[in-house]
Amino acid sequence: MADLHRQLQEYLAQGKAGGPAAAEPLLAAEKAEEPGDRPAEEWLGRAGLRWTWARSPAESAAAGLTCLPSVTRGQRLAAGGGCLLLAALCFGLAALYAPVLLLRARKFALLWSLGSALALAGSALLRGGAACGRLLRCEEAPSRPALLYMAALGATLFAALGLRSTLLTVLGAGAQVAALLAALVGLLPWGGGTALRLALGRLGRGAGLAKVLPV
């Protein structure tokens, strides 16, 4: 802006070279803003920071990417494999409590829930951060049985670790099993409702044949 003002003054001075009066400036000189006029911006500049709204979209996207940890494929596979091994260990320890399930119901449910949580974490790590990011951004809607299973899993862990209640832990484990069965039935090609009607129909026909046939 200062260069344009100077060039305009030189052009007017050349046009009125023979006049007694000097050319008056048409534009007022704008005072350049010095860095020290704004203490907050000066301090942020020394710290290497900028206001979020002062960044361009490209800079905001780059800043968002740098905030994410850089994990290689090998590290993700190692972490996922470790979670799956710990899940297998928890499932194995839970199987040891199966003969005394009535006496150690809370420990069995706790180990089973920890194994399920570790298995889910390992599967998420092996699946990759992009797929998990799509779920967190609600770009992929999870199914209702999956949400119910996650809620039952969290409730079981809270009842076992926080409340230390055997009854609530057993109820949470039962809710886990029901949600898991609903999720597995929902994965069938013909749908959960059709599969349930088919199973009930077969059970009804089997009961009718048992009544008709002689023993």
UniProtKB/Swiss-Prot annotation:
One of its GO terms (biological process) is vesicle-mediated transport. Belongs to the SFT2 family. May be involved in fusion of retrograde transport vesicles derived from an endocytic compartment with the Golgi complex. Residues 1-82, 129-142, 188-215 are cytoplasmic. The chain crosses the membrane at residues 83-103, 108-128, 143-163, 167-187. Its main location: membrane. InterPro entries: Vesicle_transpt_Got1/SFT2, Vesicle_transpt_SFT2. GO terms for cellular component: cytoplasm; endomembrane system; intracellular membrane-bounded organelle; membrane. Coiled coil: none annotated. It is a multi-pass membrane protein. This is Vesicle transport protein SFT2C. It comes from Homo sapiens. It is found in: Membrane. Keywords: Membrane, Protein transport, Transmembrane, Transmembrane helix, Transport. Residues 104-107, 164-166 are lumenal.
